[in-house]
């Protein structure tokens, strides 16, 4: 008989509420918890990560691309675009998240089972689409198996927030500021309402992204640059932009499939190879 191969169970922790609750629900089944850090995250994100480590009773591994920031990834590897307007793929996602995950996968000899924080609403077809986000993940990553603890238990976003609060864990600051996810500050996937809120809450980030758009002659929004955006455009109610993570990677994977030479172009600023660096905070590098 062939020996039984035990898979490696990995939670891709996004530092969002749903991801944290999903990880906690299956903590005894999970072998590794991994967070991909980007320097554009709100500083409170690492506080939340440390609180979750205590809640889980487990260490969260932190991986990070050596590009570190959204602007660096776009300038060094964006090839003149911030995100593709039709497909939604973001250059920063490709290099700051997707590449890091793929480099991890290349080092793993065991079958991989991924645990994701999608809630029950994301198991239903999206407006205008035949498939759900959950189905999209399975279709986009057929080499891995996938678990969705919140979906399996019928838990929605609101319930996940309630469960986190009941555990005494303060959610990331971006939620309390009125955002519906803990994405990078100034996420390039945001809509007009999102960007007008960023304009008020983080004016320096708004100005930096507007300058970046002009530098690469590509906009975050469809048909308008940020420095031309009507301050009254868009609206804030409802999710302002989707959670950053695997759905962004699905778009980026689609770009790879349709543009096989996309990543072969030389980048600006030297010949250093792509790679993953360790934790950005020594507390997590050396243990607490």
Name each model-derived stretch:
Residues 1-288:
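Nucleotide-activated chemistry modules centered on ATP-dependent adenylation/adenylyltransferase
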């Amino acid at each position: 008989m062939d020996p039984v191969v035990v898979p490696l169970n990995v939670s891709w922790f996004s530092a969002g509420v749903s991801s944290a609750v999903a990880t906690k629900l299956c903590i005894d089944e999970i072998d590794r918890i991994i967070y991909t850090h980007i320097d554009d995250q709100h500083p409170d994100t690492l506080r939340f990560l440390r609180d979750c480590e205590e809640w889980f009773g487990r260490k969260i591994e932190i991986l990070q691309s050596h590009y570190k920031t959204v602007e660096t990834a776009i300038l060094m590897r964006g090839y003149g675009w911030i995100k593709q307007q039709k497909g939604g793929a973001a250059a920063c996602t490709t290099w700051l998240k997707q590449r890091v995950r793929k480099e991890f996968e290349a080092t793993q000899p065991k079958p991989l089972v991924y645990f994701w924080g999608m809630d029950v609403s994301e198991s239903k077809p999206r407006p205008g689409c035949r498939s759900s986000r959950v189905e999209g993940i399975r279709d986009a990553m057929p080499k891995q198996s996938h678990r969705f603890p919140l979906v399996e238990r019928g838990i929605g976003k609101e319930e996940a927030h309630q469960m986190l609060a009941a555990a005494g864990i303060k959610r990331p600051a971006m939620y309390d500021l009125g955002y519906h996810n803990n994405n990078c500050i100034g996420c390039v996937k945001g809509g007009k309402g999102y960007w007008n809120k960023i304009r008020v809450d983080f004016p320096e980030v708004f100005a930096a992204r507007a300058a970046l758009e002009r530098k690469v002659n590509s906009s975050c929004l469809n048909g308008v640059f940020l420095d031309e955006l009507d301050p009254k455009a868009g609206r804030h109610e409802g999710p302002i932009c989707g959670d950053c993570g695997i759905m962004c990677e699905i778009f980026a994977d689609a770009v790879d499939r349709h543009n096989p030479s996309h990543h072969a172009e030389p980048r600006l600023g030297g010949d250093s190879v792509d790679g993953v660096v360790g934790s950005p905070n020594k507390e997590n590098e050396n243990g607490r």
